[in-house]
């Protein structure tokens, strides 16, 4: 009768050791990979200047200037970006928050956002060279629109964008376009000691 008890005690001791060893090895958090680090192009504060195309907000709607700011910061240990924006679009204030991250399972980038107009966006992105392409859906007041959003990095501090919308993927038309420019971070003035 002692043999099964000893064997059971031995098996439990080995299992406990394996569990403890595994727990100790997993205390070092993983580091973001190169795909995640590509999101760094969006980190910082940017000014946005653009235009909503004539007719984009309904028949005979005029073109409207877009001005505002975007700001993105690393979150979740550097695995994603939390971004906020505040725009004036033809006198209407748009403000929202979004989350960008890399999904290693699908090998695509993801974006989820919400704004003060009740719009909810869900997009999937890819990057090729300096061009990011985002496709997905946006729902406003229960109506779903398809979106194509393309950004082209033109320098380390700016990118140009175009956005198209439609009720189906085949009916998308240009909605807006413009340019984001990184705001230079001012360095604090340094004073020299009195002589």
Q: Language-model segments: what does each one mean?
A:
Residues 1-9:
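Bacterial N-terminal signal peptides that target proteins for export
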Residues 9-18:
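Bacterial N-terminal signal peptides
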Residues 19-23:
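Sec/Tat signal peptide C-region and signal peptidase I cleavage site
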Residues 24-195:
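Hydrophobic small-molecule pocket/channel-lining residues, especially in calycin-type beta-barrels
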């Amino acid at each position: 009768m002692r043999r099964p008890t000893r064997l059971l005690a031995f098996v439990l001791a080995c299992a406990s050791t394996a569990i403890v060893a595994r727990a100790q090895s997993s205390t070092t958090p993983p580091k973001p990979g190169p795909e995640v680090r590509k999101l760094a192009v969006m980190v910082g504060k940017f000014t946005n200047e653009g235009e909503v195309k004539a007719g984009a907000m309904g028949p005979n709607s005029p073109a409207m200037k877009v001005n505002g700011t975007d700001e993105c910061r690393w979150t979740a240990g550097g695995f994603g970006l939390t971004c906020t924006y505040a725009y004036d679009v033809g006198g209407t204030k748009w403000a929202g928050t979004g989350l960008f991250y890399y999904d290693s399972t699908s090998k695509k980038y993801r974006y989820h956002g919400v704004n003060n107009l009740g719009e909810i966006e869900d997009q999937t992105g890819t990057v090729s060279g300096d061009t990011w392409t985002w496709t997905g859906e946006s729902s406003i007041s229960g109506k779903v629109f398809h979106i194509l959003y393309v950004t082209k990095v033109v320098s380390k501090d700016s990118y140009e964008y175009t956005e198209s919308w439609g009720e189906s993927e085949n009916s998308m038309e240009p909605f807006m376009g413009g340019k984001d420019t990184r705001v230079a971070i001012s360095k604090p003035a340094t004073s020299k000691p009195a002589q």
